[in-house]
Amino acid sequence: MNANEFVHATPKEIGKDTVVITASQRGNTAETVKATAVANELGAATVGLTFQVPSPLSDTAQYVIQYEFGPESVVENQKVSYGFKLALEILNEEEGYEKYDEMVQALAKLNDIVVQAKKDIVPDAIKWAWEFKDDSVIYTMGSGACWGPAHQEAICIFMEMQWINASVIHSGEFFHGPFEITDKNTAFLMMKSCGHTRPLDDRALDFIKKFNNRIFVLDASQYGINELGELAEYLEPMFYNNVIGVFNNLIADARKHPLTTRRYMWKFPY
């Protein structure tokens, strides 16, 4: 849930029997800190995930987890992984989860899969960066758990860090309107699911290929994610969050636009 939405439209269930997990890279996102404070006031247990400690978030949350960040960080020690592990632990403690041990092992194994995938993906990533570097609009696509990474790529990388107009399209929503923008020059980036929603991605992909040859499909199943069996689809977001970094660094270099460049963010109050 968006932090500022939580502040202004707080779910009525929030109270002493609730755990609220918030996250901020620098720990100073005002809306996130405020949401944490609101949860505290309502009696909830609050857990803050942040890379920077001390920070306003670490000072506000009742419990703090400092996660790892960067190309050398271990996948299971990253922000999204900690959020996932917290949900997993709560589920197992409250209701029991028959695949708990398997999930813990799969999450630990994911790091090795990601490390190898980041090496294997380089040739395709270089080709993609040079082909897409001059596009003024790029649409990301995904479904199921992969919609999250596709959304993050659109708003945090293309729009925030590269100043490329972008929008995320859920593969299941593609035929409810968005498919009308498809032509031979439309730029698409799909993060394909290996799980239950893969048919949604395939349906959209089949249509796009009839009218377009500028869609790049990043498919985790080609890079070892299936070694995790039926649990793979739960862990795909962490896979894509890491592997897509190879693409992001390369397109930033190709466009001569560093990922750290900002016009407005952190420049003045807003």
Where are these regions (language model features)?
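Glycine-rich phosphate-binding loops that contact phosphosugars or nucleotide phosphates
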Residues: 1-100, 191-221
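Internal helical hairpin/lid segments
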Residues: 148-215
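Aromatic-enriched
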Residues: 106-108, 216-220, 237
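Phosphate-coordination loops involved in phosphoryl transfer and adenosine-cofactor binding
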Residues: 16-17, 134-135, 185
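Glycine-rich, charge-decorated loop segments at or immediately adjacent to ligand/cofactor-binding or catalytic sites
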Residues: 53-65, 178-181, 224-233
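Structured C-terminal subdomain patch of bacterial secreted/periplasmic proteins
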Residues: 210, 221-260
